Design a protein with these regions (language model features):
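Phosphate/nucleotide-binding beta-alpha loop and adjacent structural elements of enzyme active sites
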Residues: 1-160
Length: 160
């Protein structure tokens, strides 16, 4: 995508969400968003991966949520929610949908609870996989890079 077009797209999306965007080099994730006329506070760890997720989900709309014309989507499942940015963007795009958010990393629970406070998103602090059982989380740097490892005595439940 042309740099000017990408800048204008990001600028427009930021304005619609209630914050300013003047360029990626000086950009900081905002602590508040305007969602359907409601101001919500954002809570997140200061990590490069979280920054990249915010830009790709909210500014670049990598999931094309703004382009889906039907509002008849009734259920959305966010598996591996991290701090919940996709679920928040889905709430913006589909205000009446039932949203289920799954995240196995207990270190992110506080961020998720804060971010979902007034958004009617159902949070489950467990993993989702092919088979139900127990797992262990393997942290690989930033929180969005964590991986699950099957472990019958692991501390985290995985549902299928």
């Amino acid at each position: 995508m042309n740099k000017i077009i990408r800048f204008l797209f990001r600028y427009y999306r930021a304005k619609k969400l209630g914050f300013k965007f003047r360029g990626i080099s000086s950009f900081k994730i905002p602590t508040k968003l305007s969602l359907n006329g409601k101001i919500i506070k954002l809570s997140f760890p200061e990590e490069k991966g979280v920054f990249i997720d915010f830009v790709s989900i909210f500014l670049d709309d990598d999931y094309n949520l703004a382009r889906i014309k039907t509002k008849k989507i009734l259920t959305i499942v966010d598996i591996g929610a991290n701090v919940g940015f996709f679920s928040i963007a889905a709430r913006l795009a589909f205000p009446n949908a039932k949203i289920f958010s799954y995240e196995p990393n207990n270190q992110l629970e506080g961020y998720l609870q804060d971010n979902f406070l007034e958004l009617n998103i159902e949070l489950q602090m467990n993993a989702v996989g092919r088979d139900s059982g127990r797992i262990q989380l393997h942290n690989c740097g930033d929180s969005n890079q964590s991986r699950v490892v099957s472990n019958k005595e692991g501390p985290i439940e995985m549902c299928s």
